[in-house]
Amino acid sequence: MEVKDANAALLSNYEVFQLLTDLKEQRKESGKNKHSAGQQNLNAITYETLKYISKTPCRNQSPAIVQEFLTAMKSHKLTKAEKLQLLNHRPMTAVEIQLMVEESEERLTEEQIEALLHTVTSILPAGPEDEQSKSTSNDVAMEEEEPA
């Protein structure tokens, strides 16, 4: 197999999630069965990819949120790949941002990192794991407050 253009387009997890969800719905509606081995492989890959991606923050994103995020990111001097990583992973700490932004020590001040972190957390919705860990920590806090 020959790769014609390796960087034809970069897709966010949200775009892949939407594409695979739509594909799954189309196949359900058309009633195509899993006859060929290739079809079974495609179904397995689609299932595993959707299973993984549904655990990421992209599950709660929408086209409007993605557009708002990209508009807000214009003021930050980041590459397309760095913006894509921020969109896909929704970092919650300065350390996570420093890991995603190449040469962040030279390119960004602490104030810029904090501003970037604020932009990311205020625009992008939390992922399923973030919500679950938040509810778990709230449950623990409530148990500690109740007298035994």
From Swiss-Prot:
InterPro entries linked to this entry: HRDC-like_sf, RNA_pol_Rpb4/RPC9_core, Rpb4/RPC9, Rpb4/RPC9_sf, RPC9
Record's subcellular location: Nucleus; Cell membrane
Any single Gene Ontology cellular-component annotation: acrosomal vesicle
Residue ranges, annotated region (Disordered): 124-148
Pfam families according to UniProt: RNA_pol_Rpb4 (PF03874)
Membrane topology field: Peripheral membrane protein
Domain of life: Eukaryota
Keywords, comma-separated and alphabetical: Antiviral defense, Cell membrane, DNA-directed RNA polymerase, Immunity, Innate immunity, Membrane, Nucleus, Transcription
Keyword Nucleus attached: yes
GO biological process, one term: transcription initiation at RNA polymerase III promoter
Tissue and organ distribution: Ubiquitous. Most prevalent in testis.
Predominant subcellular localization, coarse grouping: nucleus
An MF annotation (GO) of this entry: calcitonin gene-related peptide receptor activity
Family: Belongs to the eukaryotic RPC9 RNA polymerase subunit family.
Described function: DNA-dependent RNA polymerase catalyzes the transcription of DNA into RNA using the four ribonucleoside triphosphates as substrates. Specific peripheric component of RNA polymerase III (Pol III) which synthesizes small non-coding RNAs including 5S rRNA, snRNAs, tRNAs and miRNAs from at least 500 distinct genomic loci. With POLR3H/RPC8 forms a mobile stalk that protrudes from Pol III core and functions primarily in transcription initiation. Pol III plays a key role in sensing and limiting infection by intracellular bacteria and DNA viruses.
UniProt protein name: DNA-directed RNA polymerase III subunit RPC9
Organism lineage: Eukaryota, Metazoa, Chordata, Craniata, Vertebrata
Gene (name only): Crcp
